[in-house]
Amino acid sequence: MRKNGEETRTVLDGMEIIQRNNFQNFTLDSVLLGNFVKINRKTKKILDIGTGCGVISLILAKKSKAEITGIELQEKMSEVAIRNVNTNNFQDCIKIINDDIKNYDKIFSKDEFDVIVTNPPYFDYDGNINQISDLTQISRARHNIDITIEEIVKISAYLLKNNGSFSMVFRSDRLVEVLGLLTKYNLEPKRMKNCYTGKGKNAKLCLVEAIKDAKKGFVIEEAIYVYDENGEKTEYIKKLYGKDI
C-alpha cells in the first residue's frame, strides 16, 4: 500500500512526469487536450490555466517555441509542475506561477495571450460534503470549489488577443452549457472533437476550440476512440503516449 504523498513517475511521449498520489494526477483528458490545441508560427504566448503537474504545458512545449505560462492555485502541485519542467529541460520556455487565476488582472495584461488552454474541474459543487474526496486537494481539482467554468471563460476572454484561441476539455453532458458560455463572452466555437471509450458508446468527453471575436463557422472533427473492438487501446491513443500502454 502506497504512503500518502508518495511520488510516481510516468513516461509520456519521451517525457518523465512526476506525480504525487495525494494530488489529482494527470489523465487521458489532459493528454488529449494538449494534442488537440492548434499552434502555428505566430503563436508567441500560451497560458495553461490550472496546470496541475504541468503535463499540458509540457506537451505544448514539445510542438511549439512559444513562451508558455502555467498557473496553478495549489502550492504543492505547482512545485511538482516546476520539477517536471526542469526534469524535461523546458525551463527556458515554460514558467509556472503559483497563484489564483482570479487575480488575473494583477498578474497578466489584457489581450496578452495568443492561446489559452484549460482542463477545468468537471463537477459542480453545491456544498454537499458527500460529493467530495477525503483529500481536499483532489476535490479542488475535480469540483468547482475554487472557480467555475464560467469564470474561466470570462477570464480567458479578457486575456486573449483578438483572434486568439481558447481550448478546453470537459464532460460531454456539459456541452450545451459550455457552448452557451463561450458565445456569451465572444469566444466563437470553431471546432470540436468527441471522445468515446469505444464504438457504440456515448461520448464521455468533448474537446472544443473557440476563437475570440471570430466569424461563425463550426466543424465537428473525427471522433476519438480510446478502445478498439478487442478492448485494446487504439493506435491513436498509443501514439499519444509514445509507447505501448
Where are the regions a protein language model picked out?
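Mobile active-site "lid"/loop adjacent to the S-adenosyl-L-methionine
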Residues: Y122-E151
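Conserved Class I SAM-dependent methyltransferase catalytic core
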Residues: E16-I17, N22, I145-A203
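Conserved SAM/SAH cofactor-binding pocket of Class I
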Residues: N35-I129, K154
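Class I SAM-dependent transferase core
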Residues: R2-N40
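Short, structurally constrained coil/turn elements
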Residues: V11, F90, T183-N186
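Short, Lys/Arg-enriched, disordered terminal segments
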Residues: M1-M15, D105-D111, G242-I245
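A structural micro-motif
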Residues: M15, K44, A66, D92-I94, ...
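SAM/dcSAM-binding transferase cores
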Residues: K201-I245
